Design a protein with these regions (language model features):
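Nucleotidyltransferase catalytic core that binds NTPs
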Residues: 1-200
Length: 200
């Protein structure tokens, strides 16, 4: 597995990672814990890559966005505890057979990217040809970008439906089952309550 450490300062200096990569299908997230929801996303990523004859690429963030904003507020306790370290994430993603992981430096420059600038970066610097995203994925400054924005930009997007404890539910129903949604946040809450049976 190839690991790319992405710093916008480097990109703005004129350096590109495009020569390092084949064409890619990308998914984006914290992937903290690589739980069942993440695993479903990665399986869909690999399926899409196989169908489109592309390499698999995962973008994660360092620090994680909530950690960055907690530092800004000088309130580190407001950031959730990690389920996995960066090195553990990279190991898990390698074991899953991902071709490339992009570790994006989440800083003021990154959080200030407009949706268009973010999409430009994916296409021109990371050779992204399509994406696999969760149904609630937002990006860009003030979270103005979403899957529909990317489609209008010209990037095909496969949306994975919400993963719950017992089933995969349709996107339209996902808001009704938010309490059952598999997420790193929910796993932390269940662990804190000692509900290890549900966590596993």
């Amino acid at each position: 597995m190839k690991t790319i450490f992405l710093d916008l300062a480097t990109i703005h200096a004129g350096n590109s990672h495009s020569s390092l990569n084949a064409d890619n299908v990308l998914t984006i997230g914290n992937f903290d814990g690589v739980h069942l929801g993440h695993q479903a996303m990665l399986k869909q990523l690999k399926q899409s890559a196989s169908e489109q004859q592309l390499d698999t690429m995962v973008m994660i963030f360092e620090p994680q966005p909530r950690e960055y904003f907690a530092q800004l507020k000088s309130d580190l306790s407001s950031a959730p505890a990690r389920l996995t370290s960066q090195d553990e994430k990279l190991t898990l993603l390698a074991e899953f057979g991902i071709d490339t992981v992009v570790v994006a430096k989440f800083d003021e420059a990154f959080r200030s990217l407009s949706a268009s600038e973010f999409a430009d970066m994916l296409v021109h610097h990371l050779n992204v040809k399509s994406l696999v995203l969760g149904d609630d994925f937002k990006f860009g400054h003030d979270r103005t970008g979403d899957s529909e924005f990317l489609r209008n930009y010209g990037l095909p997007v496969t949306n994975l439906h919400t993963i719950t404890d017992t089933q995969v539910v349709d996107t339209q129903e996902s808001s009704l089952l938010e309490d059952k949604r598999i997420s790193s946040t929910r796993i932390r809450e269940l662990s804190a309550k000692g509900d290890l049976k549900t966590v596993s």
